[in-house]
Amino acid sequence: VQAFAQHAPQSGVIHIATHALFRADNPLFSGLLFADGWLFAHDLYDYTLDCYLATLSACRTGAALVEPGDELFGLMRGFLAAGAQSLAVSLWPAADAATLAVMVRFYSNIASGMPRGAALRRAQLETREEYKHPYHWAAFALVGAR
């Protein structure tokens, strides 16, 4: 958490690969587990991020509680409220090897100049050749600016 607090506000890209917890009973206490503690969704409201992309490579980081008015509460909302332009989030737990394959291709596509949404789509389609079942390659979605 301390390293995140120190480096995230001035980082253009944030990639977090860790364990996550979604709390449907209190989604603002959904969090990411770091070596020195939890970063909760409600903590993110105290940050000012200026990042092009935040990738939350952990189980169910895209999970959210839908409240009246179609308000979504969870880690996504916290990162977007803090200023992240876009998020790559997981919709379900995915195998580490398949996630690695998607992420390597995703960042390679971005580095070649592809927009974030197209980069993730291509990465998933390429990974589909190696891992046939959608469980492996379709876990990630892009939220925010594409």
Role assignments for model-derived ranges:
Residues 1-146:
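Catalytic cores of enzymes
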